Swiss-Prot record:
Main function: Catalyzes the interconversion of 2-phosphoglycerate and 3-phosphoglycerate.
Name assigned to this protein: 2,3-bisphosphoglycerate-dependent phosphoglycerate mutase
Record's keyword terms, sorted: Gluconeogenesis, Glycolysis, Isomerase
Gene behind the chain: gpmA
Residue numbers annotated as active site: H9, E87
Nucleus among keywords: no
NCBIfam families: pgm_1 (TIGR01258), PRK14115.1 (NF010713)
Organism: Coprothermobacter proteolyticus (strain ATCC 35245 / DSM 5265 / OCM 4 / BT)
Keyword set includes Isomerase: yes
Family under the similarity heading: Belongs to the phosphoglycerate mutase family. BPG-dependent PGAM subfamily.
EC number assigned by the record: 5.4.2.11
PROSITE patterns from the UniProt entry: PG_MUTASE
Length: 248
């Protein structure tokens, strides 16, 4: 049996303001820092250790990972950063308030943008400063791979190959792997591992700052998964994510 641990970054400044974030490179909030520190302490208390870590190129995931590893005295392990683990790109919605968009477009439309599998948000123009092609960190990424917006289906299409090509080989080598990522890049992995339908993944909310453990068999199929948190705490955190369309 193999194990892999995933964690969604701690609360970001834009999570706190209830804004669509996507690839916008915002920092952790004070609460997000506390969540990451708590996660690191929890993993250490539960006896976890890691040989290698993977994260995105966005600072909220990178800083979460750094804080977790610091609490575990594992600052020295190899860390691989890749844009394919980035959050889903929310296109023209990035920087807009979720509750205000609900008032403007209706709850059903915003739920489709946030939680459906194959409905993308409104796209950016390439002249928009929010387009990743205008950010030097993506200079080596082929232009046709840089999104103007993404559905969860699009996100899965870029995340799963990275999982298969980079993360799975490390797991099969017997390395203890930690992934620090984002709500939708994690939902993409969860959907793939658990063979969930679009309807099932639409109901799945990933809370910030709580380690999610997957136990995998020799074929990298899930045996079981669980969060390192008690049920009441977990439910409250999941409900926070679900309620974002109402909170200004």
């Amino acid at each position: 049996m193999y194990k892999v641990v995933m964690i969604r970054h701690g609360e970001s400044e834009w999570n706190k303001l209830n804004l669509f974030t996507g690839w916008t490179d915002v920092d952790l909030s004070d609460r997000g820092v506390e969540e990451a520190i708590w996660a690191g302490k929890k993993l250490k208390e539960e006896g976890y250790t890691f040989d290698v870590a993977f994260t995105s190129v966005l600072k909220r995931a990178i800083k979460t990972l750094n804080l977790v590893l610091e609490q575990m005295n594992l600052d020295w392990i190899p860390v691989y950063k890749h844009w394919r683990l980035n959050e889903r790109h929310y296109g023209a919605l990035q920087g807009l308030n979720k509750a205000e968009m609900t008032e403007r477009y209706g709850e059903q439309q915003v739920l489709l943008w946030r939680r459906s599998y194959d409905v993308p948000p409104p796209p950016l123009e390439k002249t928009d400063p929010r387009w990743p092609g205008n950010d030097p960190r993506y200079a080596l990424v082929p232009e046709d791979e840089l999104p103007l917006c993404e559905s969860l289906k699009d996100t899965e299409a870029r995340v799963v190959p990275y999982w298969a090509d980079m993360i799975v080989p490390a797991i099969k080598e017997g390395k203890k792997v930690l992934i620090s990522a984002h709500g939708n890049s994690m939902r993409a992995i969860v959907k793939y591992l658990d063979k969930m339908s679009g309807e099932e993944i639409a109901k799945t909310n990933i809370p910030t700052g709580i380690p999610l453990v997957y136990e995998l068999d020799e074929s990298m199929r899930p045996i079981r998964h669980y969060y390192l948190a008690d049920e009441d705490f977990l439910k409250a955190k999941e409900q926070e994510v679900a309620n974002q369309i109402y909170k200004k």
